[in-house]
Amino acid sequence: MSRKQLALFEPTLVVQALKEAVKKLNPQAQWRNPVMFIVWIGSLLTTCISIAMASGAMPGNALFSAAISGWLWVTVLFANFAEALAEGRSKAQANSLKGVKKTAFARKLREPKYGAAADKVPADQLRKGDIVLVEAGDIIPCDGEVIEGGASVDESAITGESAPVIRESGGDFASVTGGTRILSDWLVIECSVNPGETFLDRMIAMVEGAQRRKTPNEIALTILLIALTIVFLLATATLWPFSAWGGNAVSVTVLVALLVCLIPTTIGGLLSAIGVAGMSRMLGANVIATSGRAVEAAGDVDVLLLDKTGTITLGNRQASEFIPAQGVDEKTLADAAQLASLADETPEGRSIVILAKQRFNLRERDVQSLHATFVPFTAQSRMSGINIDNRMIRKGSVDAIRRHVEANGGHFPADVDQKVDQVARQGATPLVVVEGSRVLGVIALKDIVKGGIKERFAQLRKMDIKTVMITGDNRLTAAAIAAEAGVDDFLAEATPEAKLALIRQYQAESRLVAMTGDGTNDAPALAQADVAVAMNSGTQAAKEAGNMVALDSNPTKLIEVVHIGKQMLMTRGSLTTFSIANDVAKYFAIIPAAFAATYPQLNALNIMRLHSPDSAILSAVIFNALIIVFLIPLALKGVSYKPLTASAMLRRNLWIYGLGGLLVPFIGIKVIDLLLTVCGLV
């Protein structure tokens, strides 16, 4: 789900942005943007010259100089407005998040258990390690981990999803977020952060972007723009002595106008807005990025590691068949499989219990009355089970059970290997059940590949992005699902260590890797990946290791994140191309007008046949200001994005924004010149 999008020019935001644009006229704010700082200095200088001319202290056309000065100030204001509007949209999103924060009291427990004595304290005084009790109707006062209990939680204020989620102690669903509301039951929570450090606080700070740091590409582009500005500044400075030597010195006002039209003011004025808008579009997709660097890295990603369950498949694997080993009847296998799954609360575990009940009327046993020891699943052991009445029953992956059988002096039957291969080739996941060292048979778990996912992977392939499916299934099952889904590669029987090693392998080949994760065991790989999208429903460790958080915990958001990142880079590149290309038309407008009196041969460059030198210069300056406003929607929304290879994308952008950048100014400056002439303003 995506959040409700603000209108591009929301009236209240526009009014606020106009006020902020005026406030940003102070030198301290302008200094942060070197290109626009030069325009600001030029505006100040021409204003002083206009006043001097009007008072008679300097010779010259005061009205013309004032017009140039006015439009230079408008140029600065438009650039400020673009940045302020982008920031205003982000702050509006942040304000919606601030509404989630409520001044509340918390019940701080004196002992870490339900029923212990509690003290009522303000929620903002809770510290890391404090234990609190929340019950139905309460707002969770802090980020933390559930240490006891289970409850239905409404997280819509943060995720935008209306469906409640279950939070309970143990496993990967123990993490809770401050500001969410308990709908039923109760939870005992251990606070994991101090005041001001909650996930909501960090979300608000990131969205507001008050301290937004420039990304590496943004810094590199800024350096390029500064270099171009210095070159044009030096070139303009040398033109005055040339014109003076020719006997007709060009005025300082004209030189300032020439400089402003030569330097890349269009991209200089929109650069900050593009960066802020990229972060804002991420939030619109229900993804919080910790920095602009993360969004930018998403645009450069060329390897996607995608979890099979929930991303490629629907993620609701269900037990579909019991396949007994030779000499074992199906009911015996079903009984053992059900016993091994009684404490397994995963959808797969519950489906095994239900299938045994449906096939053989095997009722669920009372867990407490069994006096059994349950063995939980771990990423290392890759199996789970039960120890009961001297019986040791396990279910798990083929390799894990094979090692278990051999460690207990048994032999893995060849007929079970054949059954495992048969299940795997059908795209189902085989789970093997063993009692002691005797293999009882195979459980087939069937999942379904999501509709349309193959076409999405084909689009990613067009963009030269490699897709890798990560799964705990064996190689045969993984290969069958990978072929059906259309991924480029897969990692079967994946462990946390294997995922980490795979990421490092791709990074050693100078590739940028993106992945998703939600569990504590995903944290090392998330920390290593260049773009790491943690699920909001995941553990605190996973969210801290990632550089993005999918608020609605949808793992397919990784593909959307890459699209948004690429769109931001394309927008920046396209507008840079347009900005530099449209300078060419300004050369043909201003240079003949400024120097034709000194060097009549330059009249040959007046291919637009502009009315007069004054109208030519003023038209170019006006166009230079107005083009910033016309490009603000493009900077905020991003350029139209299509899945293409890098070379095809470059050709497309050169045609649209390079050629467009050449033609639009010729038309625009000529139209403005005609209007000025018709209205008798020059």
Curated annotation (Swiss-Prot):
InterPro entries: ATPase_P-typ_cyto_dom_N (IPR023299), ATPase_P-typ_P_site (IPR018303), ATPase_P-typ_TM_dom_sf (IPR023298), ATPase_P-typ_transduc_dom_A_sf (IPR008250), HAD-like_sf (IPR036412), HAD_sf (IPR023214), P-type_ATPase_bsu_IA (IPR006391), P_typ_ATPase (IPR001757). It catalyses: K(+)(out) + ATP + H2O = K(+)(in) + ADP + phosphate + H(+). CDD domains: P-type_ATPase_K. Its main location: membrane. Disulfide bonds: none annotated. Keywords: ATP-binding, Cell inner membrane, Cell membrane, Ion transport, Magnesium, Membrane, Metal-binding, Nucleotide-binding, Phosphoprotein, Potassium, Potassium transport, Translocase, Transmembrane, Transmembrane helix, Transport. GO terms for cellular component: plasma membrane. GO terms for molecular function: ATP binding; ATP hydrolysis activity; magnesium ion binding; P-type potassium transmembrane transporter activity. PROSITE patterns: ATPASE_E1_E2. It is a multi-pass membrane protein. It is found in: Cell inner membrane. It comes from the Bacteria. The active site is at D307. Mg(2+) binds at D518, D522. ATP binds at D344, E348, F377, T378, A379, Q380, S381, R382, M383, S384, K395. It is an enzyme of class 7 (translocase). The chain crosses the membrane at residues 34-54, 62-82, 219-239, 254-274, 588-608, 616-636, 656-676. Its EC number is 7.2.2.6. Belongs to the cation transport ATPase (P-type) (TC 3.A.3) family. Type IA subfamily. The system is composed of three essential subunits: KdpA, KdpB and KdpC. Part of the high-affinity ATP-driven potassium transport (or Kdp) system, which catalyzes the hydrolysis of ATP coupled with the electrogenic transport of potassium into the cytoplasm. This subunit is responsible for energy coupling to the transport system and for the release of the potassium ions to the cytoplasm. This is Potassium-transporting ATPase ATP-binding subunit. It comes from Shigella boydii serotype 18 (strain CDC 3083-94 / BS512).
